């Protein structure tokens, strides 16, 4: 198969839907020689910031000189973004070769029973781990796909566990309240492995995490208590902060909320130190100062300012809205598209507060809320709301509406931002 055929086969697996559980991924990896046992790892779960924390952790490891892997999901524009080594996406030819090998095992498993057929995410996870193993990755930052306890990534034996802030999400699969969702995410905690979290020690979610850690004999380190950091300033040039005992660091990522994410990555580096992986202060500082993570309060254009942000929970929307209030004096032109397993009304409320007008849209996935439903949520918060079915057409319309002094915000989902970014990148390349 060539590259496009390979992608076609992979994405064809999405018809298998979502099947949470570890039996199939365990069998598939065993047939591949258990590649997950050939590298060390940091496992990252949570609702807000887990991708950013994973990227920061990988950047720190790379700047220390380790051969570092990064596995995240979903992707923004290119599938290969999900699987990186030292900041380089998996090559097309490597992807094709490994998928061809995986396909044989998948077809063999399908002969056993339809229930044993691996899903898209399980195959993608096996692909990532195989690439890491054969490429000599020493340590990888691995982001959970959904939940944690039954997520396909939960076959690794990490050196550190990170759980970011938790919000209501994926309620169809993870539970209808924060306690249930926290229980699923705490399912990645392994016996004797330290847990780092940004959850408030007063929250219900933290109580669940702490209890799970206690049962497995794991110390818990809380950002803001055990791991200290301080925001010095946030501007269009980045986020200046003081962290732990390494002093001032300037993150290239915008948003004061990135400070807590950086503190978790710093905490992971310190824990890896304790477990025998040398990571110097300079590597932490350089890793954080040079991290790249597109689609997170990313300014891609000026006159007007065009901002892409993948926030998909009310907590994330609130944090981004507060930062945009600080960074810009004017109200924004909002383009919003949200998946149907998210808290649309909560997201719309926070973004609506800072918007003078809005374009409701929907990314091209059956999982998205219809654009008209998004508009309904926005109308109670924004003076003027219009509907545009296509994300690209919404962006075109937003650019036409915005004056040179305006801020145009595209947000609500990684899928929404991904479609906008793909079009924007092509436009800029002309």
Question: What are these model-derived regions, one by one?
Answer:
Residues 71-72, 197-200, 212-234, 251-256, ...:
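Beta-strand->loop->alpha-helix junctions that form or flank phosphate-binding loops
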Residues 199-217, 221, 236-237, 305-308, ...:
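C-terminal helical cap/extension that packs against the catalytic core
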Residues 22, 26-30, 34-37, 63-156, ...:
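ATP-dependent carboxylate-amine ligase catalytic core
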Residues 38, 134, 139-144, 151-162, ...:
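Nucleotide phosphate-binding/pyrophosphate-handling subdomain across enzymes
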Residues 57-62, 132, 351, 378:
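Hydrophobic alpha-helical packing residues
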Residues 124-173, 206-248:
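Extended acidic/charged loop-beta regions that coordinate divalent cations
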Residues 1-48, 52-67, 76-78, 194-204:
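N-terminal leader/targeting and accessory segments in enzymes
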């Amino acid at each position: 198969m060539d590259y496009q055929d390979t992608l076609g086969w992979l994405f064809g697996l999405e018809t298998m839907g979502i099947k949470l559980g570890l039996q199939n991924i365990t069998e598939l990896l065993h047939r591949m020689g258990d590649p997950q046992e050939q590298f060390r790892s940091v496992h990252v779960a949570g609702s807000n910031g887990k991708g950013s924390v994973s990227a920061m952790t990988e950047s720190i490891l790379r700047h220390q000189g380790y051969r570092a892997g990064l596995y995240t999901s979903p992707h923004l524009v290119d599938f290969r973004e999900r699987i990186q080594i030292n900041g380089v996406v998996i090559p097309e030819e490597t992807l094709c070769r490994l998928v061809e090998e995986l396909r044989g095992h998948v077809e063999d498993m399908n002969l056993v029973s339809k229930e044993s057929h691996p899903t898209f995410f399980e195959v993608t996870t096996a692909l990532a781990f195989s690439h890491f193993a054969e490429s000599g990755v020493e340590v990888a930052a691995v982001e959970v796909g959904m939940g944690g306890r039954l997520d396909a990534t939960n076959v690794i034996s990490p050196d550190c566990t990170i759980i970011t802030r938790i919000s209501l999400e994926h309620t169809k699969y993870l539970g209808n309240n924060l306690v249930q969702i926290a229980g699923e995410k705490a399912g990645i905690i392994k016996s004797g492995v330290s847990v780092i979290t940004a959850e408030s020690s007063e929250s219900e979610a933290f109580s669940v995490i702490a209890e799970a850690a206690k049962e497995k004999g794991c110390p818990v380190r809380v950002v803001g208590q055990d791991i200290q950091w301080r925001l010095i300033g946030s501007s269009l040039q980045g986020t200046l902060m003081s962290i732990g005992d390494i002093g001032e660091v300037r993150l290239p990522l915008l948003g004061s909320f990135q400070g807590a994410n950086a503190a978790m990555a710093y905490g992971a580096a310190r824990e890896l130190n304790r477990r025998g992986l040398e990571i110097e202060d300079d590597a932490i500082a350089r890793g954080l100062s040079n991290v790249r993570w597109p689609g997170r309060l990313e300014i891609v254009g000026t006159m007007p300012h065009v901002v892409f942000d993948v926030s998909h929970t009310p907590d994330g929307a609130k944090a981004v809205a507060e930062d945009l209030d600080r960074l810009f004096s004017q109200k924004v032109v909002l383009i919003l598209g949200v998946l149907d397993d998210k808290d649309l009304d909560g997201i719309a409320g926070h973004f609506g507060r800072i918007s003078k007008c809005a374009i409701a849209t929907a990314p091209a996935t059956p999982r998205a809320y219809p654009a008209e439903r998004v508009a309904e949520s926005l109308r109670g918060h924004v003076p003027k709301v219009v509907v545009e079915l296509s994300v690209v057409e919404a962006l075109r319309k937003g650019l036409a509406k915005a004056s040179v002094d305006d801020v145009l915000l595209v947000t609500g989902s990684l899928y929404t931002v991904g479609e906008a970014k793909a079009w924007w990148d092509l436009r800029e390349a002309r």
